[in-house]
A protein has these predicted regions:
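Conserved acidic segment of CheY-like receiver
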Residues: 18-30, 35-39, 47-48, 56, ...
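Active-site beta3 strand of CheY-like receiver
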Residues: 62-73
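A short, hydrophobic beta-strand element within the central beta-sheet of small alpha/beta folds
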Residues: 67, 87-101
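Alpha4 helix (beta4-alpha4-beta5 surface) of REC/receiver domains from two-component response regulators
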Residues: 75-80, 96-115
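Bergerat-fold GHKL ATPase/HATPase_c domain
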Residues: 99-103, 121-188, 199-213, 253-255, ...
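Conserved beta-strand-loop-beta-strand hairpin that lines the nucleotide-binding pocket
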Residues: 144-150, 198-335
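Short, low-complexity patches enriched in S/T/P/G
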Residues: 334-345
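Ser/Thr/Pro/Gly-rich low-complexity linker/stalk segments immediately outside membranes or between
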Residues: 364-379
Length: 415
């Protein structure tokens, strides 16, 4: 039934309120209804098409802000979306916990988010993802919790600090309701992420690892100049651990490389030269959400979110993986102080010394005696024997001149 003119006008006014537009490829009517409501919450208008051939119609209003594809439908594949606004970032929707499919999606340069859509779908995850992609503010575990949830922060500068931080995380996880086996798996993920931030993330100005070549025993005695920041929070159902370094050496290619190992039945031993190692695989198979916030040459934040209810039911492993990249430029290095040639400095110093000695000599000369000629205004000596005293000042020296009339002469003396 066609809509009335009044309804159409209301829809046009509503479209003007929403600043962003998201193009979604899906054949699922239920998903269309759900995503339309969710995207309205973030100020975005959602346009749906069922086939990539309909892109021409969808592009009449210009390119969208984001593209979303529902890979649960057999006819929709990663290859089919290659030509759909290839310059726009892509969110992939999958139907199950398929690590190989997750890695394949993230291997696309334009794709940074893979979300599972089933009966356990979490709307908040989709809202947070779209908001971060649209506005670019990617760091912070507080984005994954409602207002009012307490966030606990710690800083790690040594091996002993790491042990204390893990004790705090385990104690807080127990208070939050995590049972023994679940708590142990969460602690293992936390330790792996902290080790990556402490030992694998630090690099020099040329990007070469600082500590990766050192033996483990020697690493336990190092105090780190750039501290690792660890945060944790819980709302009773979700427990999150965030680990942040201050180097920003982790890139998306490395993340995808190690996440792809999650699809292997038998994991290879960790190669210490490989960087983040199998700790990321451990997080992939334990946490329910895994978020990588990357700021090249600035910092890396890895957030692992655990759904306590799902984990207690035996449903471990990621349901969504996100790799966000901060496009800020790294701060420029501090400029080197200008180098001044030594020869002019020496010559200038000698000149100053000579001037000082000259001034001292003049003062001493003044103090030795009055000058031979002094001009001053004196009263008229109109008779023989009349005397007058005239005060004068030479530099900082006060003198008095005595004038005496002797016949036709005037005798001047100082005292």
């Amino acid at each position: 039934m066609p809509s009335s003119p009044r309804t159409g006008a209301a829809e046009r006014r509503g479209d003007q309120i929403l600043r962003h537009r998201i193009l979604c490829l899906t054949t699922d009517p239920a998903m269309r209804r759900a995503l339309k409501r969710l995207m309205t919450a973030v100020g975005a208008l959602t346009e749906f098409i069922a086939d990539p051939s309909q892109v021409a119609t969808a592009s009449e209003d210009g390119p969208p802000s984001l593209v979303c594809i529902d890979l649960r439908a057999p006819e929709l594949t990663l290859a089919s979306v290659e030509a759909v606004f290839p310059e726009k970032r892509l969110i992939c929707i999958v139907g199950g916990q398929d690590f190989a499919q997750i890695s394949a999606c993230l291997s696309l340069p334009r794709c940074g988010s893979v979300i599972t859509y089933d009966d356990k779908f979490e709307p908040e995850d989709f809202i947070i993802t779209v908001t971060k992609l649209l506005h670019g503010q990617i760091f912070g575990v507080q984005k994954y919790f409602p207002w009012g949830v307490t966030l606990y922060n710690m800083e790690i500068a040594s091996y002993d600090d790491k042990i204390k931080a893990l004790d705090v995380l385990c104690a807080y996880a127990e208070l939050a309701g995590a049972r023994g086996p679940v708590r142990d798996r969460m602690a293992l993920v936390a330790e792996e992420l902290i080790i990556n931030a402490m030992y694998h993330a630090p690099v020099d100005d040329e990007g070469k690892p600082l500590f990766r070549h050192l033996p483990r025993k020697e690493l336990t005695h190092i105090d780190f100049e750039r501290r690792v920041k660890v945060s944790c929070a819980s709302n009773g159902q979700h427990f999150a651990i965030a680990v942040r370094d201050q180097y920003g050496s982790l890139d998306k290619d490395t993340v995808v490389k190690f996440l792809s190992k999650g699809a292997l039945a038998i994991l290879e031993p960790e190669n210490r030269d490989s960087g983040a190692g199998l700790g990321l695989v451990s997080a992939l198979k334990t946490a329910n959400q895994l978020i990588f916030n990357l700021a090249p040459a600035i910092g890396t934040e890895v957030i692992a979110v655990f759904d306590l209810d799902l984990m207690h039911q035996g449903h471990a492993g990621v349901r969504s993986v996100h790799v966000f990249t901060d496009r800020r430029r790294p701060p420029p290095p501090d400029p080197e102080p200008p180098r001044i040639p030594m020869a002019p400095m020496v010559a200038g110093a000698l000149a100053v010394i000579l001037i000082i000695f000259g001034i001292v000599g003049v003062v001493r000369k003044i103090q030795e005696g009055p000058p031979t000629m002094v001009s001053a205004e004196v009263p008229l000596l109109d008779r023989d024997g009349k005397t007058e005293e005239v005060p004068i000042k030479v530099g900082n020296t006060d003198l008095k001149l005595r004038l005496e009339r002797k016949g036709s002469r005037v005798v001047i003396s100082s005292h």
